[in-house]
């Protein structure tokens, strides 16, 4: 059997296995007006087992989007408002003494769920941020002397308000790097906002149907891993990430003094995983360069450090990524 035959068979399998993506999108569109990119990124994160950092002003349906997704796949959802007085125990749980049983018992925190919305994550102290990020990385929580596995799928969507920065605790670069995607959400278009008004003036707000089970997502993840990625695509991904570290090697010497640090190997891994998930969403069994380009900004924008010179000239990571994509040779 030739490679082409294998890929053709895999492609047919993916087309069949990915049909539920359209059903999820259809159910979410009943509730979410516009924000197609946000819905797409939620699916990428869900299918590639990656967490998402959202940046956008309040009122752009961030909570509604992840809550709706949890209902569509019949999963559990928790929204945690991060505040300066929040403690790690408020997040993960603690040991409490039961007078009835005359012993300490575990009271699990809200993080023991499938979908977590960590609202305004940069408002909580470093200890709380660290507790959340440990759960994201290890998929487990330690309370007292016992360690508890978190349910799968486990997806964290953390939000940051780009405008209000007073009284916040910015996330360290090492912790931000643990988010697979950083998605910037913009305001809806005029016609979309008119539909939002109409929707909210209806007698009953639309409700999504539960069409899947969390176990279906776990099965889908196994299929996503089977999506074929050629060595040329892998090299393309490595070149993109290396261009953020050594821009001069790729004819981008003008960025050498503008970038303080580039993407880590985790960036390469996340770019490959996100590209596979994107190909799956597009009902393909193989990754093409356009898949990598489609997810590149969301995967890389929080993994490039800008120097004072870059900030002084108003250079953004968006512009750097776009320039890299225009310069690095496409296979």
PLM features per residue range, with description:
Residues 1-9, 14-15, 247-331:
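C-terminal engagement/docking regions of AAA+ P-loop ATPases
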Residues 11-18, 31, 168, 182-254, ...:
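Conserved C-terminal "switch" segment of AAA+ ATPases
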Residues 14-60, 242:
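Pre-Walker A (pre-P-loop) alpha-helix and adjacent loop at the N terminus of AAA/AAA+ ATPase modules
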Residues 41-44, 97-117, 146:
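Conserved alpha-helical scaffold flanking the Walker A/P-loop in AAA+ ATPase domains
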Residues 46-83:
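Walker A/P-loop
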Residues 52, 116, 154:
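Conserved beta-strand position immediately N-terminal to the Walker
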Residues 56, 119-120, 131:
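Walker B catalytic acidic pair
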Residues 98-103, 120, 124-128, 136-227, ...:
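Canonical AAA+ ATPase core
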